[in-house]
């Protein structure tokens, strides 16, 4: 589901951060300050236009409310997360942020306003610091370290052979899955979504 593969941090990025679907129209509404209300109403979705993956899904999240999607493999948790981030367009229904249809919001503004950590972590070959900074490329070292502390990753990072300068290889294969997840949380934190 979503975009797979590890891509070096250039103009191309992993599906989590800047995936673009060739058939999606860009929104026109500038979204500068997210209040945080999310409404999905009667959402239907299929990846291929034929086999429906989600049918008549509705949810409402109040500003500041934390929601966890739990369920069996294949139940649609990742799909819902991908739709909330508009990695795909829905077939039917509505998704609105603060009363604004998600299709009208500029994708860059939407993605900047959301912090998402998916179950499958995407890290790239580079330093720990570079992998955290990937959440916001202009973040300072101090901001990245603060994000790592917020994610409870700073202590394990400092125990690595080169600390924040430790090179990660092959999607972070030299880290445990839990450590990689903490880096992903730090990456989302440094992006500083409202």
Show where each model-derived region lies.
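ABC-type nucleotide-binding domain
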Residues: 2-194
């Amino acid at each position: 589901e979503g975009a797979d593969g590890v891509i070096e941090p250039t103009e191309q990025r992993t599906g989590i951060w800047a995936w673009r679907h060739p058939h999606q129209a860009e929104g026109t509404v500038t979204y500068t300050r997210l209040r945080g209300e999310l409404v999905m109403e009667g959402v239907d979705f299929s990846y291929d236009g034929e086999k429906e993956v989600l049918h008549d899904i509705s949810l409402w999240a109040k500003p500041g409310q934390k929601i966890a999607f739990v369920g069996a493999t294949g139940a649609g948790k990742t799909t819902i997360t991908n739709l909330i981030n508009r990695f795909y367009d829905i077939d039917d229904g509505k998704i609105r942020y603060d009363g604004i249809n998600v299709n009208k919001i500029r994708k860059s503004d939407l993605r900047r306003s959301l912090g998402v950590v998916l179950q499958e972590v995407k890290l790239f070959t580079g330093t720990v610091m570079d992998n955290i900074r990937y959440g916001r490329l202009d973040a300072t070292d101090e901001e990245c370290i603060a994000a790592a502390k917020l994610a409870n990753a700073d202590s394990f990072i400092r125990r690595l052979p080169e600390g924040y300068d430790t090179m990660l290889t092959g999607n972070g294969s030299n880290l445990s899955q839990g450590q990689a997840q903490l880096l992903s949380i730090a990456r989302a934190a440094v992006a500083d979504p409202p």
